[in-house]
């Protein structure tokens, strides 16, 4: 009983982790407009297509670094301040006849890339896998194919940028699906603790009747036990997709960021066929 409760707790924590992670990512990704204080806007990283030149911020907007005269050094200097260890410069943004003063953080390309990564993660879809046999008609010791529609298996990108005196500094972050995983309960008693796992590179292969029963797939799992012993009569599993995160920037710098996984729960009913003796 303790093992069963532990398995249920692990699956529940996984679901909560996915939910909280999605809310957290959406909150961070939507925080690109910042806030305002004393009539001045505090801005985060800008989202979308960057300007094509140092002064253009779209078809009718311009960004200008604001300066002030410093008597101590005898010439003008840009207006800046440090908040939580990050230095912000004050820019004037003009769009037609309207303008606003906006504090823009000084960030390295990798920091802008991480902001874009938050946007990408918020856009990644939860996987929807197919199974053969179907989840309601699986059989012990009979291989199960699982796969993702190839049209779903495509990269997802986002671009973030900040204005600088040298023109916009942008970073483009791309998440590329690389691995499909399947984790499931697979125990023979109502209190057992056996678990099953399989993974493969790529989206897997779609099963077709013309392939026959002896064909193999890189994405395949074979249940060892029937699910009839479970109180619900089924096994709970998780299908996941691992995404590789990479980025490029306007400076030529680029690299990779920690991979990310999207997941979804699946329910499988596994029967055990009894041989007939004549």
Feature map (PLM): residue ranges:
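N-terminal export and membrane-targeting signals
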Residues: 1-12, 26
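Extracellular/lumenal mature domains of secreted and surface-exposed proteins
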Residues: 24-278
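Bacterial N-terminal signal peptides
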Residues: 9-21
